[in-house]
């Protein structure tokens, strides 16, 4: 069998934060290979699949991944040798069964995911297809709207902003290439505005600027100014999006935000004010991962006006997503491959979301590599949205460049999601 897995190798490498992660290389009988590298998050949900670390304080502060590498070279390779790489579902089920734990803690979700993705890449190579086409079939032609994280706060930066990500979304662009240009020009304008005001232009983990500001609203004002200075119309050409990462704010049942302890209802009141004043079309993790009652109330109040994205709430887990669907919590899900740990489970979660009318956003992690799989996955699944950081740092730009290549390859068949990818909304213009 030409597409049988013949060998698997793995290496400990570094991610964009200088922390260890791993890569796996899968080789098939016909000579095709697939290389995959896995990311790591900073603000992680409690219910994510387990990332296996060595725990040896003498190496990388205990964060080495040599045990995960050994699991790939040993039991995983033994289990998969001779299996057909074209049967992704079987490969992933074998990995899940071999691990035998609910959260992949025996072999490590990082080890399992690296092999799962590398297998898919090897299979795509074996049949002579680009990854997005191999995974998505003939109708994979939708380029996602990028949610570009240009101002960083929270766990992604050393500053005084509580909200973790302030994003721009080029909804009015006619193509992905133009969307990327819109974003790059706003990013350049934002840097100029920060310099003019004597503010820091140092960047956070995801490439966004990380200045100290008077308030979270001041960060939004900066974005509005930068959009206008770049020659674009807020709410028409470029909209805004936020990732609050509210788990990081929760202490003793209350949200500690801008120096005050707030209830879930008070947080929702705050978001409602922001929606009235700014063209915000997406709000991620506005409340904590176990605040189901708060999420239900927030969705009832705001869900018709804004995309409410569950990241820590759902952790790409179909069981948690089903709970959200059944209880009316959120209306969109962030998809992170390493939260669940295999390609098959990731795609199954996306399918469940789509069937329930939830929107899907394919996402990077704060600790990234040069791997571009999520760009192909976004096109393959017709997700319509992607989060892969700012307009600097090569591990972020790599994904954008891959999307440019895909769009060029698709030619006239390419469709840019734009505003439609985030749903038709009457976004308010600046009303302050």
Curated annotation (Swiss-Prot):
Signal peptide: none
Binding site for (2R)-2-phosphoglycerate: 164, 336, 365-366, 387
Encoding gene, per UniProt annotation: eno
PANTHER family found in the cross-reference section: ENOLASE (PTHR11902:SF1)
Superkingdom of the organism of origin: Bacteria
Pathway note: Carbohydrate degradation; glycolysis; pyruvate from D-glyceraldehyde 3-phosphate: step 4/5
Protein name: Enolase
Catalytic-site annotation from UniProt: 206 (proton donor), 336 (proton acceptor)
GO MF: magnesium ion binding; phosphopyruvate hydratase activity
């Amino acid at each position: 069998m030409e597409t049988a897995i013949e060998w698997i190798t793995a290496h400990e490498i570094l991610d964009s934060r200088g922390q260890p992660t791993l890569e796996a290389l899968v080789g098939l009988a016909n000579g095709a290979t697939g290389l995959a590298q896995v990311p790591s998050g900073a603000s992680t949900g409690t219910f994510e699949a387990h990332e296996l670390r060595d725990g040896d304080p003498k190496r990388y502060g205990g964060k080495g991944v040599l045990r995960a590498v050994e699991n790939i070279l040993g039991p995983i390779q033994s289990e998969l040798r001779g299996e057909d790489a074209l049967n992704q579902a079987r490969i992933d089920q074998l990995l899940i069964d071999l691990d035998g734990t609910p959260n992949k803690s025996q072999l490590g979700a990082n080890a399992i995911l690296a092999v799962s993705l590398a297998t898919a890449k090897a299979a795509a190579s074996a049949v002579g297809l680009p990854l997005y086409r191999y995974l998505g079939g003939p109708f994979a032609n939708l380029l996602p709207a990028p949610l570009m994280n240009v101002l960083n706060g929270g766990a992604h930066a050393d500053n005084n902003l509580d909200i973790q990500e302030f994003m721009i979304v080029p909804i009015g662009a006619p193509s992905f290439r133009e969307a990327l240009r819109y974003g790059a020009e706003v990013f350049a304008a934002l840097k100029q505005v920060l310099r003019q005001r004597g503010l820091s232009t140092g960047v956070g983990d995801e490439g966004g600027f990380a200045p100290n500001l008077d308030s979270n609203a001041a960060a939004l004002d900066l974005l509005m100014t930068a959009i206008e200075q770049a020659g674009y119309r807020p709410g028409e050409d470029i909209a805004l999006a936020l990732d609050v990462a509210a788990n990081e704010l929760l202490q003793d049942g209350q949200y500690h935000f801008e120096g005050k302890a707030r209830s879930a209802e008070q947080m929702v009141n705050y978001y409602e004010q922001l929606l009235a004043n700014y063209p915000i079309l997406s709000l991620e993790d506005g409340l904590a991962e176990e605040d189901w009652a708060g999420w239900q109330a927030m969705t009832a109040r705001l869900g018709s006006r804004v995309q409410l994205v569950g990241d820590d709430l759902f952790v790409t887990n179909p069981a948690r997503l089903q709970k959200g669907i059944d209880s009316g919590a959120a209306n969109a899900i962030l998809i992170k491959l390493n939260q669940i740990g295999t390609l098959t489970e990731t795609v199954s979660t996306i399918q469940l979301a789509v069937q329930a009318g939830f929107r899907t956003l394919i996402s990077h992690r704060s600790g990234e590599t040069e791997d571009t799989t999520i760009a192909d996955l976004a096109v393959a699944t017709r997700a319509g949205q992607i989060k892969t950081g700012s307009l600097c740092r090569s591990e972020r730009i790599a994904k954008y460049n891959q999307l440019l290549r895909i769009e060029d390859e698709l030619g006239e068949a390419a469709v840019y999601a734009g505003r439609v990818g985030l749903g038709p909304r009457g976004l308010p213009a600046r009303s302050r």
